[in-house]
From Swiss-Prot:
The active site is at H233. This is Non-specific ribonucleoside hydrolase RihC. Hydrolyzes both purine and pyrimidine ribonucleosides with a broad-substrate specificity. One of its GO terms (cellular component) is cytosol. One of its GO terms (molecular function) is uridine nucleosidase activity. It comes from Shigella flexneri. One of its GO terms (biological process) is purine nucleobase metabolic process. Its EC number is 3.2.-.-. HAMAP family: Nucleosid_hydro_RihC. PANTHER family: INOSINE-URIDINE PREFERRING NUCLEOSIDE HYDROLASE, NON-SPECIFIC RIBONUCLEOSIDE HYDROLASE RIHC. Pfam families: IU_nuc_hydro. Belongs to the IUNH family. RihC subfamily. Keywords: Glycosidase, Hydrolase.
Length: 304
């Protein structure tokens, strides 16, 4: 039986690969997509997501979400993904539009209609998920679990300790981590290992039309290089859903720092139980890299 999922995303070049896997992995049933400001503005992430859905002729409803964080000024990652978020490929024009309601309400409505609890996957800042929990707390029993790409048990990638998706809206992340829902965190500890090799990247143009498109996008992606390999951060959240055996997880207490002058956005991961608090997150700490790379190749070969 395919696993029903809703995907909250901020495309973003590595998001494009994650979206492809979410649509075409035979184990998954992607039923709803929502966008959030993150890598670029929410107008751009929505445009990019609609372009990808049209490219793959995927009839999946999409709702536009939060344009700004809960309480602070927005930040982006255009330096990594380019000003448009997905530069490098000329997508054809289309007439697709997002749903007429905000993302958190679209998630609420879809959860309430679902015959069983649904897995949420968030690969951008957690603003939409926090809004859902704050505005629609009655939805919590309908969430099977939340799988996120975000956070780190060690070093960060936008401050010394903070990972971008959490640092972009620390208050939202803190709300989500305190919520009591089941959370799996695929942070930098594993995503920095999730590298597609130069040899594999070179084969993409001959793979299929998606391979050609991704290869063009990757030439503008700044999380690694075509010569040294590219990190597929967001894809790890999808990979865990399909191949949890590739990941080493540990239950930990995790809090999000929202006040520190130098540490705001840090995920404080209590690996050794020093704080004596009950675990609230399953934290991915290690990855079977070769197994991950093999799975990626298998999935992308299924994409038209």
């Amino acid at each position: 039986m395919r696993l029903p999922i809703f995907l909250d995303t901020d495309p973003g070049i590595d998001d494009a690969v994650a979206i492809a896997a979410a649509i075409f992995a035979p184990e998954l049933d992607l039923q709803l997509m929502t966008t959030v400001a993150g890598n670029v503005s929410v107008e751009k992430t929505t445009r990019n997501a609609l372009q990808l859905l049209h490219f793959w002729n995927a009839e999946i409803p999409l709702a536009q979400g939060a344009a700004v964080p809960l309480v602070r000024a927005p930040r982006d990652a255009a330096s990594v993904h380019g000003e448009s978020g997905m530069a490098g490929y000329d997508f054809v024009e289309h007439n697709r539009k997002p749903l007429g309601i905000p993302a958190f309400l679209a998630i609420r409505d879809a959860l309430m209609r679902a015959p069983e609890p649904v897995t949420l996957v968030a690969i951008g800042p957690l603003t939409n998920i926090a809004l859902l929990l704050l505005q629609c707390p009655e939805c919590k029993p309908y969430i099977r679990r939340l799988v996120i790409m975000g956070g780190s048990a060690g070093r960060g990638n936008c401050t010394p300790n903070a990972e971008f998706n959490i640092a972009a809206d620390p208050e939202a992340a803190a709300c989500v981590f305190r919520s009591g829902i089941e959370i799996v965190m695929c942070g930098l500890d594993v995503t920095n290992q999730a590298i597609l090799t130069p040899d594999y990247l070179a084969t993409l143009p001959e793979l299929n039309r998606t391979g050609k498109m991704l290869h063009a996008l990757f030439s503008h992606y700044r999380s690694g290089s075509m010569q040294s390999g590219l990190r597929m951060h967001d894809l790890c959240a999808i990979a865990w859903l399909v191949r949890p055996d590739l990941f080493t997880l540990k239950p930990c207490f995790v809090a999000v720092e929202t006040q520190g002058e130098f540490t705001s956005g840090t995920t404080v991961v209590d690996i050794d139980g020093c704080l004596g608090k009950p675990a609230n997150v399953q934290v991915a700490l290690d990855l079977n890299v070769k197994g991950f790379q093999q799975w990626v190749a298998e999935v992308l070969a299924l994409v038209p």
